[in-house]
């Protein structure tokens, strides 16, 4: 019984370390979202911090409302990519821990 508890504690500690590492990797990653066939690009971190906005110069000849809509769409695209990447990394970790498919980790 004593050895079993020690094993459980070691597994819990490793799981905590793995989760922290995955969260750090997610925070450090960068993704780019696009809209308007790539005419507007937004780069953001895994923490949803926008790092860069690129707008094709030809868009400035068009109306402002369209540019604003494309920027919003590119930001939303980048946010979705961060969420998708985070879910993929965390579900991979859950499978490595022997959790059933579809079981979500507590975050």
Curated annotation (Swiss-Prot):
A single MF term (Gene Ontology): DNA binding
Keyword Cell membrane: no
Region (Disordered): 1-24, 82-107
Chief localization: cytoplasm
SUPFAM superfamilies: YbaB-like
One Pfam family recorded for the sequence: YbaB_DNA_bd
Cellular localization per UniProt: Cytoplasm, Nucleoid
Record keywords, A-Z: Cytoplasm, DNA-binding
Bias type Basic and acidic residues, positions: 15-24
Function: Binds to DNA and alters its conformation. May be involved in regulation of gene expression, nucleoid organization and DNA protection.
Protein family (similarity comment): Belongs to the YbaB/EbfC family.
Subunit and partners: Homodimer.
Protein's recorded name: Nucleoid-associated protein Hhal_0231
Species per Swiss-Prot/TrEMBL record: Halorhodospira halophila (strain DSM 244 / SL1)
